Structures are given as C-alpha cells and as structure tokens.
C-alpha cells in the first residue's frame, strides 16, 4: 500500500473581505476523473458526513455544515446506485470538529474508503481499503476542517479540505456547582504566565492568574485574599500550562462543596506543589495536545468551583 501525506505545503489561502486568511485549501487527492465540486470554506464546522458505497467503491459523499448555529444541507457529490449509506456525526454543539481525513483510492481513480478523525473520536473506516493507495488530509495541530472539495462523476474520485484555526474548548466545571457567584475569564489569551494560589489548612481561598495577551500581562483575581499565598511561574511562551488537578469536598461545618486542593502541570513536565488540603473527590482538567488559556468558575466565601479553556499547543 502506498501512503501519501498531504499537509499545508500543498495548499492555498482563502482570503476574507478584511484581507485576512480565513482558511487554508488543501489540494484534492485521489483519481483524475469526474467533475470538480467545491463546498467552499464559508462554514463554522461540519455536522454530519454521508457516504454511499457499492461494489465499485464510494458512489457519493455529502456533508451537513454549520453556519451561525444552523445546519446547512450541502449537495451530493457523485451518484446513488445500489449499495449502502453510512453516516458519521460530529457533536459540534459540544466543541467537536474534524481534524483530519484518511482516504484510500484504487488504480482506476475511484475512492474506496474514508476515515474521519475529530478532536474527540475516530470514525470507522467507511468502505473497503484493500489493495489501494492511502493518503491523509489535515492533521495539523491547532487546525480544524470546515469544508471539502474534490471531483466526482459516477463515483467519488478525489477529495480535498479547507482548514482553519480551531477554537478553544471549554472543560467541565468541577467542585461546588451552586455555591458562590459565577466568574469567567474567557479564552481570549495567548497563554498563562503565572498562577498565585491563596489557601488555608482546609481549602483553597483564591487564585490570581497572569495571562499574556498580545505581549501584555493581564491579571485576573477570584476569591478571598486571607490565607497563605504561593506562586507558580510558567515560562511562557517556551512552556505552557497543560493540566490542573485537585480535589473537592464538603466542608463539615458549613455543608458546602468547595475546592480543597490544586496542583498545576506544564508542558515541560514541571509540577507545582500541592496547594491546600487533599480531601474528597479527585479531578483532572487536561486535554492531550492542548494548553490551558483561560479559567472560569465560582467563588464566594471560599473557592467553590473551577473549569478551564483549552487551545491547541502551537506546532
């Protein structure tokens, strides 16, 4: 089996009305037959993939896209004959997106099988890849697929993709989900430079976060200031914050659920001391290949809950 990898060096930029690059167009790979088709790059995400297959290979492909929160029903590329239709759904409402596509085509130039990978899962191989040439589209860290193009006639002959920068994703909120007041630093930062944690013998009181944004330091503070304070410095941009671990438990005297301890980890393998008191349910906020670029949570008399925003670590 021959394997071909197609990344950004076989591509062109799609420019929007402001003169900025909206998407990167990856050349279509596969056979030379059929007529060209192009769904364009004016989408926010892909919602669903439809593939019709038969004895000759993939007969057609079709996509549902997302634009401004609504799904768009795109055209069928190819024709429908006797065979079977398989689908692959992307949970775009929960920040899932396609990151790459593996494909297989035969000597006649007919696409035989496709496999889609998202930031959360991988589809089954749709079709039959035996005795074919394999290729890969995408797989670029920090990028997502927002559109497709290619060629098709009586079968699907080739496929290419449009890539754009992937948005930050939001973790679950852990800890006391009803106590205190909500706060949200957002995700519009380049990275985290320093975290200051204030704690007492039984719980976390507050966190103070220094973010970097366009070369400037932006500081956000959440919680109560009384207690012991320690700092954990991240050597951004040479190092990234990648993980927050900790525990949460009920305070017996107050019957409220709060964050009891915190630990931070970086992309260089450094681990902070344990701040606070380890007690109760353990949690880990981490996403492979991603850095933490923002925090949100709840606080009142104590530091009640914490969540983070992830963004891909630059290649």
UniProtKB/Swiss-Prot annotation:
GO molecular function terms attached to this record:
carbohydrate binding
Q: Which InterPro entries match?
A: Jacalin-like_lectin_dom, Jacalin-like_lectin_dom_plant, Jacalin-like_lectin_dom_sf
Q: Which residues form the signal peptide?
A: 1-23
What domain of life does the UniProt record list for this protein's source?
A: Eukaryota
Q: Does the keyword RNA-binding belong to this entry?
A: no
Q: Which residues form the Jacalin-type lectin domain?
A: 24-165, 168-312
Which keywords describe this protein according to UniProt? Lectin, Repeat, Signal
Which protein family is named in the record? Belongs to the jacalin lectin family.
What's the protein name?
Jacalin-related lectin 10
Q: Which organism is it from?
A: Arabidopsis thaliana (Mouse-ear cress)
């Amino acid at each position: 089996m021959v394997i071909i990898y197609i990344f950004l060096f076989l591509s062109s930029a799609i420019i929007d009305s402001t003169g900025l690059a909206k998407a990167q167009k990856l050349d279509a790979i596969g056979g030379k037959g059929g007529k060209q088709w192009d769904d364009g790059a004016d989408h926010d995400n892909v919602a669903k993939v439809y593939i019709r297959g038969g004895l000759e290979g993939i007969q057609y492909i079709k996509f549902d896209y997302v634009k401004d929160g609504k799904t768009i029903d795109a055209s069928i590329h190819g024709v429908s004959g006797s065979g079977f239709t398989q689908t692959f759904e992307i949970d775009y409402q929960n920040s899932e997106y396609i990151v790459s596509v593996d494909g297989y085509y035969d000597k006649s130039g007919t696409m035989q099988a496709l496999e889609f990978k998202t930031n959360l899962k991988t589809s089954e191989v749709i079709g039959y890849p035996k005795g074919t040439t394999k290729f890969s589209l995408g797989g670029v860290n920090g990028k997502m697929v927002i559109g497709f193009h290619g060629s098709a006639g009586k079968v699907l002959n080739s496929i290419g993709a449009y890539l754009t920068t992937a948005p930050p994703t939001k973790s679950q909120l852990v800890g006391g989900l009803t106590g205190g007041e909500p706060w949200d630093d957002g995700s519009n930062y380049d990275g985290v430079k320093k975290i200051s944690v204030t704690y007492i013998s039984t719980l976390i009181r507050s966190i103070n976060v220094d973010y970097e944004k366009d070369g400037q330091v932006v500081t956000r503070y959440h919680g109560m200031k009384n207690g012991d304070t320690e700092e954990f410095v991240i050597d951004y941009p040479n190092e990234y914050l990648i993980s927050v671990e900790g525990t949460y438990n009920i305070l017996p005297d107050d019957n409220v659920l709060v964050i009891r301890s915190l630990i931070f980890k970086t992309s260089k393998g450094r681990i902070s001391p344990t701040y606070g008191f380890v007690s109760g349910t353990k949690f880990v906020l981490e996403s492979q290949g991603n850095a933490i670029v923002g925090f949100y949570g709840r606080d009142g008399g104590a530091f009640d809950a914490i969540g983070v925003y992830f963004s891909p670590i630059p290649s």
